[in-house]
């Protein structure tokens, strides 16, 4: 199992714990640890799904917020555990970040893809990666790929969690 380099994970990202808690609450999962989950899902299915979201986001960027980089942004997907039923535990890394996110149930698969791909579409902010612009892009992706009602509901719950997602919000949230 690959180790997680926590050197890029900032303690100043006050939104991080709240966002992960919001994700699990909104998608109906259960928190075992704040950032680690496991999912039995076909590796090929997950790869295809994540690549579809990522490609769609790059072709029609959300508010033209594409991370500017000389290298092509990528979503690194690792096969960690292959089971006899051809499912596996999947781990995803956003480009230039070392946060590892895994999900506990198949219905959380969409959340994992949306969450990580949103990191690839917004400018890097390693000190506070879950700042207002990321939340805005995340909500737009949810509106496109899940539905307007879901996006509105998500942002309403985000307000209850005191997560700032508007332009006048500070990166520390």
Where in this protein do the model-derived segments appear?
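Metalloprotease/metallohydrolase-associated module, dominated by Zn2+-dependent proteases
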Residues: 4-108, 124-173
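Active-site recognition of the HExxH zinc-binding catalytic motif
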Residues: 111-124
């Amino acid at each position: 199992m690959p180790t997680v380099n926590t050197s890029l994970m900032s303690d100043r990202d006050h939104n991080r714990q709240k966002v992960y808690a919001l994700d699990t609450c909104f998608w109906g999962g259960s928190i075992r640890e704040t950032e680690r989950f496991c999912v039995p899902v076909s590796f090929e299915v997950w790869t295809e799904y994540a690549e579809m979201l990522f490609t769609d986001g790059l072709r029609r960027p959300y508010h033209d917020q594409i991370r500017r980089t000389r290298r092509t942004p990528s979503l690194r997907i690792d096969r960690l555990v292959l089971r006899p039923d051809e499912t596996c535990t999947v781990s995803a890394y956003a480009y230039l970040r070392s946060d590892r996110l895994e999900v506990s149930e198949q219905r959380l698969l969409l959340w994992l893809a949306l969450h990580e791909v949103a990191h690839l579409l917004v400018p890097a902010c390693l000190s506070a990666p879950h700042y207002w612009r990321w939340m805005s892009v995340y909500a737009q992706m949810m509106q496109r790929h899940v539905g307007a009602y879901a996006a509105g509901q998500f942002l309403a719950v985000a307000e209850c969690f005191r997560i700032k997602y508007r332009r006048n919000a500070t990166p520390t949230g």
